Amino acid sequence: MKFAVFASLLASRAAFAPAQQSARTSVATNMAFENEIGAQQPLGYWDPLGLVADGNQEKFDRLRYVEIKHGRICMLAVAGYLTQEAGIRLPGDIDYSGTSFESIPNGFAALSAVPGAGIAQIIAFIGFFEIAVMKDITGGEFVGDFRNNYLDFGWDTFSEDKKLQKRAIELNQGRAAQMGILALMVHEQLGVSILP
């Protein structure tokens, strides 16, 4: 596990290395996405690796879809991690042999304590959501629009400005959650408690 944390830290080193700039890159292609949601203060438009320097809208939309999806997953992960750290557990047993939810440790240690059938159920549940529910709806209002006529929460009642504001908030909170869950995992491996 320490190797995984070390590898992720080593890989993140590239985020701080200067990106090579092509002499042929024009200002027009570099600024193709400067007015997109997410290109906001304090960084503005930021693409240090030049992933969409060619101005390809389809590629940008795919990367945005992945960013939103991972942000949503990480927001749930941070909430779940903090809930467990606060000592909140489901009542009862996790299996028929008497393993209680209370006996399952927090964080990475839970992977070895949860029965194999439980891990299989988690993977099947995630797979079902990936295939059936959390897919980008073709022709949706925006990239990452997972509305499927089951859950709406009144989205259509908002004004266009309010929708843009809420999408920007979600994007920023998703970015923060991606950094947050990584920080929580690193703190766990370092043996540092996150709660007083």
From Swiss-Prot:
Transit peptide segment: 1-31
Membrane-spanning residues: 73-94, 114-134, 174-196
GO cellular component, one term: light-harvesting complex
MF terms in GO: chlorophyll binding
Keywords: Chlorophyll, Chloroplast, Chromophore, Light-harvesting polypeptide, Membrane, Photosynthesis, Photosystem II, Plastid, Thylakoid, Transit peptide, Transmembrane, Transmembrane helix
Function: The light-harvesting complex (LHC) functions as a light receptor, it captures and delivers excitation energy to photosystems with which it is closely associated. Energy is transferred from the carotenoid and chlorophyll C (or B) to chlorophyll A and the photosynthetic reaction centers where it is used to synthesize ATP and reducing power.
PANTHER family cross-referenced by the UniProt entry: CHLOROPHYLL A/B BINDING PROTEIN (PTHR21649)
Stated name of the protein: Fucoxanthin-chlorophyll a-c binding protein A, chloroplastic
The organism's taxonomic lineage, starting at the top: Eukaryota, Sar, Stramenopiles, Ochrophyta, Bacillariophyta
